[in-house]
Amino acid sequence: MFNIGINGSMYVGALYAGWAGYRFTDLGHYSHVTLCIAIGMFVGAAWMLLPALLRVYAGVSEIISTIILNFVAVLFVSYMANGPFRADPIAPATPRILETAELKQIFPNSQFNTGFFIAVFVAILAHFVLNKTTFGYELRSGGDGLVGMYPSRFSSYLGIPSDRSAIIGMLLSGALGGLAGAIEVLGAVRYFFQELEFNQGFDGILI
């Protein structure tokens, strides 16, 4: 499977991580940051549920559906930043997140923050899970088994439910996109605004 919708997951993950960053006011630093990241990952994963189900059960190309959802995500977060979550009467933006929700800066006057170490840790963990565990093998087999319009029988011959593995894989990739968006808001810009742009999802395809 090819998930081209990471940008969409990043947008919605960033929006709701930013929302959680100012909405919850009675939390300590680590609790608040953890909650914001968890919400961003959950929303990012949920954003990928529809294209995953369409791919597995209806044979709809996940490339087409996730690209479309990228545009839907841009329109959705634009509406939310201009409407329900808007705080600034001049600029379409959410309120600034609370200090308890901020990822700490490594260097003064720099956007380099502890989110970098979170990203490195998650990348190492993902590599280990995908290549060194049974769960990771099932994920790779399930994704590779989606050939043509419908899942091939290769995975089922191995006793691996390819449809379930494919859905879980899409949700996990969406969660990682939501994590990336959350780190951007919590560690760099400190609030969500309409003009915030994410191109890292497409950059990740090349990497």
Where are these regions (language model features)?
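Transmembrane helix-bundle core of multi-pass membrane transporters
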Residues: 62-132
